[in-house]
Amino acid sequence: MSVADIKKSEVVAQFARGTNDTGSPEVQVALLTARIVELTGHFKTHAKDHHSRRGLLRMVSRRRKLLDYLKGKDADRYRALIEKLGLRK
């Protein structure tokens, strides 16, 4: 297993709603957040990497859409996830 796989399985285990849960909005948002944090660090040293920046913006947009979906579906789960991940809003 690579480092990314180990980190991914840790995130899934931490945010899963059940034993085999990998697709719930909470897990998807947590995985996107981990990737966003990783890419943000990359841009501190590679400021002109515009190709990756476009990918980062897509991830941020996708995370925002998933959070909006979760907020409309179950506001309590939304608030708990925002607090647990330390996101604004």
Swiss-Prot record:
Name of the molecule in the record: Small ribosomal subunit protein uS15
PANTHER family xref list: RIBOSOMAL PROTEIN S15, BACTERIAL AND ORGANELLAR, SMALL RIBOSOMAL SUBUNIT PROTEIN US15M
The protein's assembly and partners: Part of the 30S ribosomal subunit. Forms a bridge to the 50S subunit in the 70S ribosome, contacting the 23S rRNA.
Gene3D superfamilies membership: 6.10.250.3130, S15/NS1, RNA-binding (1.10.287.10)
Keyword Repressor: no
Organism listed in the record: Burkholderia multivorans (strain ATCC 17616 / 249)
Function according to Swiss-Prot or TrEMBL: One of the primary rRNA binding proteins, it binds directly to 16S rRNA where it helps nucleate assembly of the platform of the 30S subunit by binding and bridging several RNA helices of the 16S rRNA.
InterPro entries reported in the protein's UniProt record: Ribosomal_uS15, Ribosomal_uS15_bac-type, uS15_NS1_RNA-bd_sf
GO biological process, one term: translation
Keywords, ordered alphabetically: Ribonucleoprotein, Ribosomal protein, RNA-binding, rRNA-binding
One protein family per Pfam: Ribosomal_S15
Annotated GO MF terms: rRNA binding; structural constituent of ribosome
Keyword Signal: no
Gene: rpsO
Family: Belongs to the universal ribosomal protein uS15 family.
GO cellular component, one term: cytosolic small ribosomal subunit
